Amino acid sequence: LEFRRVLFRSKKCPARQENGRKKKGEKGMIRAGIIGSTGYAGGELVRILLGHKDVEIKWYGSRSYIDKKYASVYQNMFQLVDDVCKDDNMEQLAKEVDVIFTATPQGLCASLVNDEILSKVKVIDLSADFRIKDVKTYEEWYKIEHKSPQYIDEAVYGLCEINREKVKQARIVANPGCYPTCSTLSIYPLLKEDLIDGNTIIIDAKSGTSGAGRGAKVDNLYCEVNENIKAYG
């Protein structure tokens, strides 16, 4: 810990000061709020946004760590993030930011979003709530009722390499999952240029346990996954 303190003090966080990064509160900064900032996806999102010269994170939401310093949860954020974690009050958050990211389990974003919120901010959801256009398929797969089916049609699948212009205009962006992203980006250019036969495609994709989230589960224990592989689908 002492070594890390010396390291950060000597370098003074160059990644956040170079490349023309604006100062906190400076005009033109995009104010972002994150609900679910302490999960694995949320933590990675924080890291990426902290390195963006035009973004300022105003809200670190976490049900599990309300009023605790974010850097006490992710110690690699020591001297980078001084904020404490807040709740998931999306209506209040919409009054304070320009864009809301939800890095939460399936069902939460759909239960929180409403017309008033969408009139104020853009919502980028990292869960599956708005990826699947067929409500019945979503409910069968995730075993939950979809709370906001009225927004599914307008949600844009946020694969920016393909839907860049639509993402810019969308009120709700459904961030793609890991398997569809790696599969689509690999295959799309080949199909677009008619270089392969779509009927011959076989996708063999594997994920580490971080893809299952940060919550404790027997299936994700070290003794269960070490030197092991489990098929699912």
Model feature map: region roles:
Residues L1-L7:
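Short, small-residue-biased leader/transition segments that mark boundaries at the very start
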